A protein has these predicted regions:
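Positively charged n-region of N-terminal signal peptides that target proteins for export
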Residues: 1-7
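Bacterial N-terminal signal peptides
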Residues: 10-20
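Intrinsic disorder/low-complexity segments, especially N-terminal tails and targeting/processing regions
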Residues: 13, 23-25, 41-43
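Sec-dependent signal peptide cleavage junction
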Residues: 18-33
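Glycoside hydrolase catalytic-domain context in secreted enzymes
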Residues: 30-37, 42-57, 61-69, 81, ...
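Long, intrinsically disordered low-complexity tandem-repeat segments
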Residues: 74-114
Length: 919
């Protein structure tokens, strides 16, 4: 298929060049069988010592001469980072960021093949355009500069700064001495091109000019399939083909290539976007990525500091915009149950904390600020947020991943759905700043009440009319994007197709638009974009052309308002040297380390650490830990994985602070793996001896918190070959928050939720089933060995977590326990041991007294568990933490220990969110 397509492109381009004409947009017929590309990688950590910013020589000059409109603190343009900057980076397990997969250079792991969607040809392959640099006339009130990145900066006197490609074909129109971009290349100044006019008028003008099918194509958000490059895009580059075919949005998974390099790549995308489809700029979105080491999600929540959240949001937005990113697919504000598989991406289990952190973060992300910190509203340092997952995705039954069939339902046995919506209606829809409201991303699952009745019928979030009606009820009017895969491409058992399994792709698109969605998350990329037009045609056939066009006009209008507010129609280009200078600065590294320090939670300290600064370099024993590699995930299905031995903490980082004693890993002696090489076994280790450890000051054990996810035994991967399920009984494994195996004798039976097939409702209960030992059980064994061999040497456990766990296996073996959410904060923990930093964080999840306490917990009700009490009598409850003075008791603990919120304050929904009105 690729060879045929390449040959076709060559022929098309040759004809175009010879004829010196443009080909009108057209999608070719084809199967859309561009294969998946998926290689999971970790994003590298920026380091002032080991990594140099690209374009370093130009960085100082770039920082001094920023874009004229970029209002912000230029004396300290960016903060964040550190040698251990990436909080998702760690030894595996919960440390890896589950939502970051990069295929090839930047493939989208959520993207499907598009079923019967037509593969896009190079829809408007254009003959070479002569370079164009405007020449201001005698009465011009603007200046023109060709930037080092080869785009043209046009600065209007008292007006907007424009960015223009030299080769897009777009030229300048001069009116009253001011410059405007002739984006549709018609030689006249259209309303949407006139930056003096109100955004609402401009957006409506452009929406009115476009045909229904053009709007459908533009609302695709399935790019970018082309290879990462810092050069102009080749004519047959998949991302260029997508843009010329009419697509305008997509998620980047290439930010790890560096800020400056990423800025060059996004400039290349925007150059193609400017050349076609009315010159509409591309929306380049990103999942939360921590590229400067700034904390987020549960790590940020553990500070319980909304002011810090605002500062991080402001700095993160500067960084993203400098690299060419305009929208964040986040934050994730699901109110997490104790066993939620995606808990690590949330702000924890409490509605008040989630409300405060999310509101502060989104408000700061979306605004641009002047040098005095005054909110200017939308501007060149603003990033639009799609807050997710509206609404209620934190209480899937069993905590199961809602990407999967097993996570098809969120359950609300405590009649508490409204609490899960507070952050939306009282927070991000009513921001205190000038941008007023964020966008949303819909959830995958179907919400059901205590009796198993669905809120809005058997429809996933993207199709759920009831959940959309709540938005209409309060007058919500911003962008709504779906989560990835809801229109197909990931199989019928994955990706939120629920309720639409029997519909064609075109029918799904039509239904989604009719129910309320605007932007098609993850859909419409290379090989799929033609299907968007098919979806519009289907919608028009169902409800008539006039109404179909009106629905898409409103969606397009919302999109244009966002992009015009961000200034993208005027200036979509970025200064690559400036991007490098603010992302990899020393200030960035220092602030990143500061935020990580503030997030670490100390839950036990038997008088071992006092905060007194150490004058000599201590010696520590750091054992290796064993993991089986087993996983059960929606992407890869059930995988036995590859067993591994690794140090529990980064020895290179620890070596900067301590003299390190550790174990020795021998040759692997297990059975051969798929690659023919032997696998590691538990016996392939030589532990440090008592004599080697005797003169150590501390034993420091790095561990990944215990968690085994609940999943269906017939789980299939969204990617890869189907499993052979012959002879495998279908049932649900229980979740577990302990290292040892667990039999769920006290679990709910029957389940609340279940799909009805042939008139019979399935029972998803896992009562009596056994969760196997945690894949990281070897981490507990390392602690057990350390405790046995340590003698009088203090044992310190550094545990990386994404939720709670049962501490009966761990706490009695430790003198000190540090909790780092999302990933090990190795630098921070080392600095605390040395007395260079003080613990500040607080638990954002209750820590259960037992697995039975978890089984008794009501899925949708926060903070209702019996909590673990340690040997010192401390209860590991929500908002518990210690510093050098003992148990923390401050304004944070007093505020967030209050009873959990249950009601939206800005609107009265009555009782409609307690129980469902329909089956």
């Amino acid at each position: 298929m690729r060879k045929k397509l390449a040959l076709f492109l060559t022929v098309v381009l040759t004809v175009v060049m010879m004829a010196n004409v443009a080909i009108p947009a057209r999608a070719s017929e084809g199967s859309g069988d561009d294969p998946y590309k998926l290689i999971m990688v970790e994003e590298p950590k920026p380091s002032s010592g080991s990594r140099k910013a690209a374009g370093e020589e130009a960085a100082a000059a770039a920082a001094a001469e920023q874009t004229a409109e970029a209002a912000g603190d230029t004396s300290d343009p960016y903060k964040g980072g550190g040698d251990n900057a990436d909080p998702y980076k760690g030894t595996g397990g919960d440390n890896a960021d589950p939502y970051k997969g990069t295929g090839g250079d930047n493939a989208d792991p959520y993207k499907g093949t598009g079923g019967n969607a037509a593969a896009a040809a190079p829809a408007a392959a254009v003959a070479e355009v002569e370079k164009y640099v405007p020449e201001p006339g005698a009465d011009a009130k603007y200046t023109v500069t060709v930037t080092p990145d080869n785009w043209v900066k046009i600065e209007n006197e008292g007006g907007k700064t424009l960015g223009l490609s030299q080769t897009s074909g777009v030229k300048i129109i001069e009116e009253e001495g001011l410059a405007f971009k002739d984006l549709n290349q018609n030689g006249s100044l259209d309303v949407y091109e006139d930056w003096r006019k109100p955004v609402e008028e401009r957006a409506q003008d452009l929406a009115d000019q476009m045909k229904g099918e053009e709007k459908a194509l533009m609302l695709a958000h399935g790019g970018w399939d082309g290879p990462f490059t810092t050069e102009p895009l080749a004519a047959d580059d998949a991302s260029a083909v997508y843009l010329r075919a009419g697509g305008r949005g997509g998620v980047t998974r290439a930010i790890s290539n560096g800020g400056g390099a990423h800025a060059k790549w996004t400039n290349a995308l925007q150059e193609v976007a400017e050349s076609c489809l009315y010159g509409i700029p591309a929306m380049i979105s990103i999942d939360p990525s921590n590229i400067s080491g700034l904390i987020e999600s549960v790590s940020l929540a553990s500070t319980m500091d909304p002011e810090l959240a605002a500062e991080i949001g402001k700095e993160t937005a500067k960084q993203y915009r400098a690299a060419g990113v305009t929208a964040l697919l986040g934050p994730q504000v699901d109110i997490s149950s104790p066993i939620m598989s995606r808990a690590g991406g949330t702000y924890g289990e409490d509605p008040q904390l989630t409300l405060d952190i999310a509101t502060a973060y989104v408000n700061a992300m979306q605004s641009t600020y002047d040098e005095n910190g005054e909110d200017l509203g939308w501007g060149p340092e603003s990033v639009y947020c799609f807050t997710k997952h509206y609404g209620g995705a934190g209480s899937t039954e069993g905590g199961r991943d809602d990407h999967t069939y097993g996570g098809r339902y969120t359950v609300f046995p405590g009649e508490n759905l409204e609490a899960h919506l507070i952050t939306y209606f009282d927070g991000v829809f009513n921001l205190p700043g000038k941008t007023k409201s964020s966008g949303i991303m819909t959830e995958y699952a179907i919400n059901v009440d205590k009796d198993g009745k669905q809120f809005g019928g058997e429809w996933a979030g993207a199709y759920n009319e009831f959940m959309y009606s709540l938005l209409d009820e309060v007058g919500y009017d911003s962008l709504k994007i779906t989560d990835w895969g809801v229109f197909g491409g990931l199989g019928d058992k994955t990706g939120g197709l629920w309720g639409a399994e029997e519909l064609s792709t075109a029918e799904r698109l039509a239904l989604g638009w009719q129910r309320g969605v605007n932007v098609l998350g993850g859909f419409g990329g290379y090989g799929e974009v033609g299907a968007c037009a098919d979806g519009y045609k289907e919608l028009a056939s169902q409800i008539g052309e006039e109404e179909a066009n009106a629905i898409l006009s409103k969606a397009a209008y919302n999109y244009f308002v966002v992009m015009m507010n961000l200034g993208m129609f005027e200036q979509p280009y970025n200064d690559s040297a400036y991007a490098d200078s603010i992302i990899f600065s020393q200030d960035a590294n220092a602030f990143g380390q500061e935020t990580q320090d503030k997030s670490v939670v100390m839950i036990k300290n038997d008088g071992v650490l006092t905060g007194e600064a150490k004058t000599e370099k201590p010696k520590v024993y750091v054992p290796y830990v064993y993991s089986t590699g087993f996983s059960a995930s929606w992407m890869m299905g059930v995988s036995e994985g590859t067993p591994s031995w690794a140090p529990g903490l980064d020895l290179n980082v620890l070596g900067q602070y301590f003299d390190v004693v550790t174990d020795t890993v021998g040759a692997a002696t297990g059975e051969a793996g798929a690659d023919g090489n032997p696998k590691y076994t538990k016996e392939d280790i030589t532990r440090a001896t008592a004599e080697e450890i005797a003169d150590c000051d501390y034993v420091l054990v790095g561990m990944t918190g215990a968690y085994s996810a609940s999943y269906n035994s017939h789980l299939q991967a969204a990617f890869g070959a189907p499993r052979d399920l012959t002879g495998i009984e279908e049932f649900y494994y229980p979740p577990s928050l302990q290292y040892a195996e667990y039999t769920a004798d006290t679990a709910r039976d029957p389940s609340i939720s279940g799909n009805t097939v042939d008139g019979v409702k399935e029972n998803r209960s896992y009562k009596g089933r056994t969760a196997p030992a945690d894949p990281n059980y070897g981490h507990l064994e390392a602690l057990q060995y350390a405790n046995e061999i340590a003698g009088d040497i203090p044992v310190i456990a550094a545990v990386s977590m994404e939720r709670g766990m049962v501490w009966t296996e761990v706490e009695p073996l430790c003198d000190v326990i540090f909790v780092s959410y999302n990933a090990h904060k190795t630098d921070s923990i080392a600095r605390m041991i040395l007395g260079q930093a003080e613990p500040n964080g607080l638990l954002v999840f209750q820590q259960p007294a037992s697995m039975e306490a978890i089984d008794a917990q009501v899925d949708d009700v926060p903070r209702d568990m019996e909590c673990y009490k340690d040997a010192a009598g401390n209860t590991y409850d929500f908002a518990f933490g210690m510093n050098w003075s003992g148990v923390i008791d401050d304004a944070r603990t007093q505020k967030y220990s209050a009873a959990p919120l249950t009601k939206v304050q800005s609107h009265d929904f009555g009782d409609k969110l307690k129980t469902a009105a329909t089956e």
